[in-house]
UniProtKB/Swiss-Prot annotation:
Catalytic activity from the UniProt record: glycerol + ATP = sn-glycerol 3-phosphate + ADP + H(+)
Pathway as given in its UniProt record: Polyol metabolism; glycerol degradation via glycerol kinase pathway; sn-glycerol 3-phosphate from glycerol: step 1/1
Binding site for glycerol: R82, E83, Y133, D243, Q244
Binding residue positions for ATP: T12, T13, S14, T265, G308, Q312, G409
SUPFAM superfamilies: Actin-like ATPase domain
Keywords from the UniProt entry: ATP-binding, Glycerol metabolism, Kinase, Nucleotide-binding, Transferase
EC number: 2.7.1.30
Record-listed sn-glycerol 3-phosphate binding positions: T12, R82, E83, Y133, D243
InterPro entries named in the record: ATPase_NBD, Carb_kinase_FGGY, Carb_kinase_FGGY_CS, FGGY_C, FGGY_N, Glycerol_kin
Activity regulation: Inhibited by fructose 1,6-bisphosphate (FBP).
Organism phylogeny: Bacteria, Pseudomonadati, Pseudomonadota, Gammaproteobacteria, Cardiobacteriales
Class of the enzyme per the UniProt entry, highest EC level: transferase
Organism: Dichelobacter nodosus (strain VCS1703A)
GO biological process, one term: glycerol-3-phosphate metabolic process
Protein name stated in the entry: Glycerol kinase
Length: 497
């Protein structure tokens, strides 16, 4: 009997493969970074070939390092950076342009022209706010600006995919062109009520329906990995979820009202809203969490574009630390931020502000400011952005938050988690397994093939590592929040003409 599930976790800065056993324990991890390209101000691109080659490499490397054979692999699950957009020639498999990354802002002005007339309609159909973040305007840009792309599309020879779709296309040698609702719901072309691609939205963005993948559930067999990549050609690809929805599932937030925050490149807070779509009055997004069988689960989401990535900037741009981990020890040498506030909106503000023209701001600097104050303000800036989303979410659901679960690379920082708990004045719960995004994809794949019988069996595997409880006096929190709000106002509309 097969003993393992492999999760392919394709992220914004690296491709990873993680092998899990039946207990949900990590057997092996392989990871490779790949470059991001910034050809113009506000543009962010990846090479589709680099995404595929690094993902294939880490999958094969993980299998080799774990010394397992193809018959030991029960299935593969895929989780991915969402919204990132690729178009390729169906006949040759060659991309017609680079992958336009979710962080890319080139279509901001175009999105602005649509907001007044179409904003309400798009919000009602998709649960999303018109923004360059989502795939629709990126597809439109490629079709309008890349020579030959529109002609290929009209002939039916062009394929669109988010990263999950591209990887499955490559793994199956072009035999399978699919996605799942968690990814489709991030394109701004998918109606989350009918669970179908929406003809009115496709017409608005002038996108031919023929280029789109088939939308299947998040947990079923889509196809098999070609024997060129795993010998035998019998390993099923059986689970798909966008990274944030996968983390919600991996955290076993499977009951209505449960929430998690992922501290990755960005920060993404999701609350399970069950089988009901909660329409936000506070600039949050309604999205599909997953679909298993015929049952659709929805979520309320708030995301900030720069979370853990700001620590990379402090390391590589500001150069006041040599390693990302060093920010914790540096920040811990001071008791507070010394009046310094860092709003790390380098690529604009996401929820709940949705300001495409905001830019990163460090404010409150004096002659007494040190690198340690800036380090602490960096960690606080991450936590305070998350605070603003939680307060918006509480208004939408009419309930106060008592705790939430955390994951992602930066959640390993005890100092950041303590700051987060202090600002919230409620408990932060960190699980033993932080690889919850990959674990969610593994669980979805395993459920499809009977590796696990149901979510109740899986839920028993979730284990708490530690809980962070608030230590900061409420009056000090109020002071921090007052100045944080002033700093946010300073960062807003910075480059608006």
């Amino acid at each position: 009997m097969a003993k393992y599930i492999i999760a392919l976790d394709q992220g914004t800065t690296s491709s990873r493969a993680i092998i899990f056993n039946h207990q949900g324990e990590v057997i092996n991890i392989s990871q490779k970074d790949f470059p991001q390209h910034f050809p113009q101000l506000g543009w962010v691109e990846h090479s589709p070939d680099a995404i595929w080659s690094t993902q294939l490499s880490v999958m094969q490397e993980a299998i080799a390092k774990a010394r397992i054979r193809e018959h030991d692999i029960a299935a593969i699950g895929i989780t991915n950076q969402r919204e990132t957009t690729m178009l390729w020639n169906r006949k040759t498999g060659e991309p017609v342009y680079q992958a336009i990354v979710w962080q890319d802002r080139r279509t901001a002005r175009y999105c602005d022209t649509l907001k007044e007339e179409y904003g309400a309609m798009i919000r009602q159909k998709t649960g999303l706010i018109i923004d360059a973040y989502f795939s629709a305007s990126k597809i439109h840009w490629i079709l309008e600006n890349v020579s030959g792309a529109r002609e290929l599309a009209e002939k039916g020879d062009l394929a669109f995919g988010t990263v999950d779709t591209w990887l499955i296309w490559c793994l199956t040698e072009g035999k399978v062109h699919v996605t799942d609702p968690s990814n489709a719901s991030r394109t701004m072309l998918f109606n989350i009520h009918t669970m179908q691609w929406d003809d009115e939205l496709l017409a608005l963005f002038n996108i031919p329906k023929a280029i789109l993948p088939e939308v299947k559930s998040s947990s079923e067999i889509y196809g098999y990995v070609d024997s060129r990549y795993i010998q035998g050609g019998k390993v099923p690809i059986a689970g798909i979820a966008g990274d944030q929805q996968a983390a919600l599932f991996g955290q076993m937030c499977t009951k209505k009202g449960m929430m998690k925050n992922t501290y990755g490149t960005g920060c993404f807070l999701l609350m399970n809203t069950g089988d009901k779509i909660v329409t936000s009055n506070n600039n949050l997004l309604s999205t599909v969490a997953w679909k298993i069988g015929d049952k659709v689960t929805y979520a309320l989401e708030g995301g900030v574009f720069v979370g853990g990535a700001v620590i990379q900037w402090v390391r590589d741009g500001l150069r006041i630390i040599r390693t990302a981990d060093a920010i914790n020890s540096l920040a811990d040498t001071v008791e507070d931020n010394g009046g310094v506030y860092f709003v790390p909106c380098m690529t604009g503000m996401g929820a709940p502000y949705w300001d495409q023209y905001a830019r990163g701001t460090i404010i409150g600097i004096t002659r007494g400011t040190t690198d340690a104050h800036i380090a602490r303000a960096t960690l606080e800036g991450i936590a305070l952005q998350v605070h603003d989303i939680v307060r918006a979410m509480e208004k939408d659901v009419g309930e106060a938050t008592k705790e939430f679960r955390v994951d992602g690379g930066a959640s390993a920082s005890n100092l950041l988690m303590q700051i987060q708990s202090d600002i919230f004045q409620f408990d932060i719960v960190r699980p033993k397994v932080l690889e919850t995004t990959a674990l969610g994809a593994a669980y979805l794949a395993g459920l499809a093939i009977g590796f696990w019988q149901n979510t109740d069996e899986i839920a028993q595997q979730w284990q708490q590592d530690c809980t962070f409880s608030p230590k900061m006096p409420p009056e000090k929190v109020a002071h921090i929040l007052r100045y944080w709000n002033k700093a946010v106002k300073a960062a807003q509309h910075w480059i608006e003409e």
